[in-house]
């Protein structure tokens, strides 16, 4: 498993290789049951019953992340704006003013890598502090996603 994270002025860019075919990694982003197993930073959960995904252009991509023992809830409301199975998913995320975030866009590319998947995520725009937090959050989520495929 390899990972590279870079930041431009306001965008986060992460590349990571997962030990599963891209069709399976792609599905993990659109199947609520699978999303509940990995989405969110380390210490967060995303309960299955709080996830709504409509895998089509304009479809909802929404979930609630619950933070640790404090049970603090963080709701994400997004729409699918590009969808090319199993190659590309782009979601536009509503603003979260209470977290100091405007509208962001998450672009996820899925590339075949000899039976594995090279995932390329571009996310933002973020101001510096939120971008650093988002990078840490994605790293934790991707660790959990990797464990889904490694049993």
Where are these regions (language model features)?
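Short beta-edge strand/loop motif at the mouth of beta-sheet-based domains
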Residues: 13, 33-73
